[in-house]
Amino acid sequence: MVPLCQVEVLYFAKSAEITGVRSETISVPQEIKALQLWKEIETRHPGLADVRNQIIFAVRQEYVELGDQLLVLQPGDEIAVIPPISGG
């Protein structure tokens, strides 16, 4: 069994509006695919499904595609959910 670790999820702009928080700590498997990590977050905040195809997902300040990429997380890692920023 893969051990769990606690990571901090940071929400920006529209994702913060949807979740109602700017950050939270969650417990997830230390080894997890990027898409599965997103699904864990989406389960907590179903409204994020509306922006899933628009967000930028970053782990330890590195962009990650929501796919089968295996992530090896460490306790305290930061996961950022960044929707597109509009403006002019």
Curated annotation (Swiss-Prot):
Family designation: Belongs to the MoaD family. MOCS2A subfamily.
Protein name: Molybdopterin synthase sulfur carrier subunit
Source taxon at top rank: Eukaryota
Subunit and interaction comment: Heterotetramer; composed of 2 small (MOCS2A) and 2 large (MOCS2B) subunits.
Record's comment on post-translational modification: C-terminal thiocarboxylation occurs in 2 steps, it is first acyl-adenylated (-COAMP) via the hesA/moeB/thiF part of MOCS3, then thiocarboxylated (-COSH) via the rhodanese domain of MOCS3.
Function: Acts as a sulfur carrier required for molybdopterin biosynthesis. Component of the molybdopterin synthase complex that catalyzes the conversion of precursor Z into molybdopterin by mediating the incorporation of 2 sulfur atoms into precursor Z to generate a dithiolene group. In the complex, serves as sulfur donor by being thiocarboxylated (-COSH) at its C-terminus by MOCS3. After interaction with MOCS2B, the sulfur is then transferred to precursor Z to form molybdopterin.
InterPro entries, A to Z: Beta-grasp_dom_sf, MOCS2A, MOCS2A_euk, Mopterin_synth/thiamin_S_b, ThiS/MoaD-like
Modified residues (1-thioglycine): 88
Modified residues (Glycyl adenylate): 88
Pfam family of the protein (one): ThiS
GO MF annotations in UniProt: molybdopterin synthase activity; nucleotide binding
Gene Ontology BP annotations: Mo-molybdopterin cofactor biosynthetic process
Transmembrane segments: none
